[in-house]
Amino acid sequence: MVINLLKYALVFVVSVLLQVLIFNNVLIARMISPFFYILFIVLLPFDTPRAMLLFLSFSLGLTVDIFTNTPGVNASACLLTGFIRPGVLQLISSRETLESVTAPRVGNMGFQWFAGYVTFLVLIHHLFLFFIEAFTFQGFPFTLLRVILSSVLSVVLIVLSQFIIFRK
């Protein structure tokens, strides 16, 4: 139990540090920004209590907001991501699968399942984040393009992290 807690605390800290120190400084073609820190929400165990999931999601976003001076933008996007995560899991997984496997990993669930799961969560996060950031539907096509391209980059980075960190 303590080892798992330390492992997830490390994932929290490392994902925030990577986001704040590296990925926030990556802007491709003035529109594509990776949001790697969502990895923490993605990797939480299936049996994480809903209140804890929401608290951790909000804390993750708030921590990034503090470092990037974006009051509430990341916190609200992460809170929404944490809120919809249980529904997404129920939508794409059977009850037996969620009870027999402890956490979402490529090794546990398979590449196709994991990529679909990550894509769904990242798209929701990015849609909310970029439209809150724009705070208007003016320039809707440009914002939607940013959502799609940034989502692709974020999903690729998150899935690649599985092969780098959890290789056997």
Predicted regions, residues:
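Terminal, non-globular segments
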Residues: 1-168
